Structure formats: C-alpha cells, structure tokens
Amino acid sequence: MRQNDVSATLALLTPEAVRQRCHEVFEAAESNALNFFQLNIENFDSAVELVLAEIAANYPSGEVPFHSRWRHFENCGRNFWHEASSSLLKESKDEIARAQIDLAVISVLLDAGAGPDWSFNDARSGLTFSRSEGLAIASLRLFESGAFSQRGSDDPLRVDASSLQALTPKILASEFQVSPSNPLFGLEDRAKLLNRLGETLKKQKNIFEAEGTFRPGNLYDHLLQKQHNGALEAREILIAILQGMGEVWPDGCWINDIAIGDTGHHQAVKRCDITDGVVPFHKLSQWMSYSLIEPLQEAGFKVNNLDVLTGLAEYRNGGLFIDSKTISIKDSTQFEIVHDLKSPLVVEWRALTVVLLDKLAEQIRLQTNTNSESMPLASILQGGTWSAGRRIAHELRANGSPPLKLNSRGTIF
C-alpha cells in the first residue's frame, strides 16, 4: 500500500475522522440528498426539550457524571463495583486502575443490546436487571468470580489473555443465565469477541504486555507514556484502543492489512484515495474510551479535551432523533425490514446521529448556562440523550425496542 494510502487509512482511527465524515453525510441531508432519511430541523427543539427534561429529572443538582459503563454498576442506591472491589483497597492506585480498566473493557465488549426478553437475577443482591444494567451486573459477577483471571479465585479481579481465549459460549450462557425462556442476543458472538480480545492482547505487545502478563489493564501503563506536561488528551485513549484492539471486531472493516473497525460506506463522503466513501463511527471503542476516563482520573491523570470524542452512534441516541421526528424515513416500508448494521440506511442514521448530538449539546449548554468544561458531551449523553432515547422508545413501543428493526449480533449495537 502506498504511503499516502497508509496515512489516509490510519487517519480513520481518530475521533476527528468520525466527526468530519459524519458531517459530510449531514450536509447531504441538509440539501435533501440522502436516499433514506429526511432532515426535519424544525422538530429539533422537541429533542432538545426531551433531553433537558431528562437531565432535570435525573440530575436535579445539575451535576451530571460521564456517560460510561460505571453508571451501570450504580443501581438501587448501591455501587456494585465498590462492593466487589473492597479487596483492592490495599493495592496501589496503579493496580486499582488496571483492574478497573480490565473490567471496563470486558464489560463494554459484552454491552451490545441484550434484546427485550433477557434479564439477570443477581442472587447476591436479590435484584433483577435487564438490558445494559443487566449485562453490567452479570459481567461484574463473572469478573469477580475469577473467570477472567489466569490465577482464578486466588487473584480474581483481573483479566488475562489466556482466560479470555478459553472462554466458551457455554460458560457465558451459564453465568448470564441464558435459556430458551431467557434468550440473550448474540451469545456465541459475544464469547467469540472475548476470545478475539485474548488473541489481540498477545499480538499487541507494545500496548498490552507488562511484566510477562497480557491484560487490557496494561493499557494504563501505555497511556502513562502518552501524557504531556502531566496531562493526557482524551483522543489518545481512543486511538490506543483503535490501534490496539482493531482486530477484535468481527464485523469490523479492513483496508488491506489495517483494521479500521466500526465503519460504513456512503456516497456523500468523497476522497481521492483508498478511503473514498468510508464513514467511521467506532461506537464501542468510544464507549470504552468514555469508560476509561474515570479510572484514569482516579489514578491521578488529568484528561483534557473530552469533547474531541464524539457522541455514540447507537440505537438509543439515534432512536431519540427518529422518535422526536427530527429525522424521518422517506419510505415507511423500511420500518418493517430487518436492517443489517452495515446497510446504507443504518449508515445514514448513525452519521446523522453523531452530528445531531453535537448540535443538541450546543443547545443544552445554551439553555443551562454551561459550557463544554462544565457540561461535556459525555455528561449530556448520560443526562441525557441515551436515557431520553430509551424513555421515548418505551412510550411509543410496548417493549421499548428501537424504531428500526436491526440485525444485531451483539457485537456493535
């Protein structure tokens, strides 16, 4: 591959590429040049009002935490992570951060939509959880059992490559209580995703090896080296994940021998190089990036420029804009079709979602007298767009499903 093509391809592994290329699809929507979606900007205020109301209801103090996996460990007035990690209190802040990153990575990878019929009965608390919260608590219980540790119950709160490679769908099904009456979307693909993570950790030694161990948590040591004047740029977290874990995604795309991950194609994005038409989203990688910020901050990192990361192109955020009629589908028969996540329609939907989240963030800050420091996009997603999308979905559809039918394998959405 020519050097220019290599550079252009690697540039796709940045948050700037996500934002720029999604904007190009949005510009086509502004001139009504998209094949599947129409932009109804006159209805945009409805989405803004929904999110403002959601933030006020969820966080009346105005102090909104980041949208991250850690929120799903906080339920019913309890912090399940703090309860599970009490044995780590004697460890250094560095080792605590490694353990948190271990958990965040595997839990995010297991977080794609569970489906409407699955739930997790947590025997320890006596509580039952579904969807993202259920997947979070189930993954935490599996983590603290030592199933991901090569040292087993002797040192359970860690994730090692060899244990990930040994994980089977049967183990996952048992721990996640999957049965014919409690089906989980994409069970086998979730197990394969963790198997692939184990393989990738061993390949990417420069990022994930430390003292003879291969752990997601060793990303902490890699990011230590990326600090400049005591601060870490948020984009460095995403770039490290994309470059280090690019081979994990089974649905990910490649350009020659470079894994470019969660991307689609659209004719509105024009380039005179090998990346012509490519639209990157990196949804799970950015969700993972948001979920690593707090462990890094707790370990003493100063993380700058959070808003370089983009909003997440997933079905709750995207559903908010369809259900608020900010965007509409030109052909209503598309609501009856099950759509592949790489389909042109879904690519348009996801690209519009990224840009509309940026525009919504501007309006939220304007109306709450905040700025990108006091109300970063990560907090607006939490406050926020994701829960507003889920709320309106339940108001409009009995099972809270997204407005579009999706062929989810449990690896992206």
Ranges and model annotations:
Residues R2-A299, L306-T333, I337, P344-F413:
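Extended, well-ordered protein cores
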